[in-house]
Design a protein with these regions (language model features):
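N-terminal small/polar loop signature for handling phosphorylated ligands or for N-terminal nucleophile
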Residues: 1-47
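Flexible glycine/proline-rich
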Residues: 43-199
Length: 199
């Protein structure tokens, strides 16, 4: 649920989740960066065993992982996602979801995401910054029988409406970009990573 920016309320909600609600894992969104209102970091640093990361990816640089021990002595995994909606989505799909699928023993099932090679149908110019960039895209079968990806219009990390149109994340390696027609790595976001079968 939603918790206000209040440390007492947040601590109570987290402890209730691990003690009364019987959760197997906690996923938080927001408050894990360096700002004045990033109280999730403040509270979890005090009550949990956490590690805080600045991951070399864009979007979704801030990320946290650790455990919060419940009253029965069980260490419950905690995934701390960034608060920006697109950053939160990307970090969940690429980091938290795979870990949760391993916990559920479903990593190789039909519900998992697939990472495949595809052809990018547009050029991306970028500058080296030490990060892997992830474009939100629409993947479909091309006439050549391969997966092709087209970019959704808006790529800014606050553009949730445009991101909702995407069914794939495309990896743009660190460097000077990729050209139209290049082969890229694609994470398919649909259940089981499936696309419509028609070309």
């Amino acid at each position: 649920g939603i918790v206000r920016d209040d440390e007492t309320e947040l601590e109570s909600a987290l402890r209730t989740a691990v003690n009364n609600d019987g959760v197997d894992a906690l996923v938080t969104s927001g408050g894990v960066s360096m700002g004045d209102y990033d109280i999730v970091k403040s509270v979890l640093s005090r009550i949990a065993d956490m590690s805080w990361f600045q991951i070399a990816m864009k979007p979704a640089k801030p990320f946290a992982f650790g455990t919060l021990r419940n009253d029965d002595g069980v260490d419950v995994p905690v995934f701390g996602l960034p608060g920006n909606p697109v950053s939160s989505l990307v970090s969940f799909e690429l980091i938290a979801r795979p870990a949760l699928e391993v916990m559920m023993h479903t990593a190789d099932s039909m519900t998992g995401r697939r990472r495949v090679k595809g052809i990018i149908d547009y050029a991306v110019a970028r500058q080296p910054d030490g990060k892997i960039h992830f474009d939100r895209c629409v993947a479909s079968w091309g006439a050549d029988g391969r997966i092709h990806v087209a970019r959704v219009a808006a790529q800014a990390s606050h553009q949730l409406a445009a991101t909702a149109l995407a069914n794939a994340l495309v990896e743009i390696p660190d460097g000077h970009g990729v050209g139209a027609g290049d082969e890229v790595l694609v994470t398919l976001l649909g259940a089981g990573g499936h696309l419509p079968t028609t070309a």
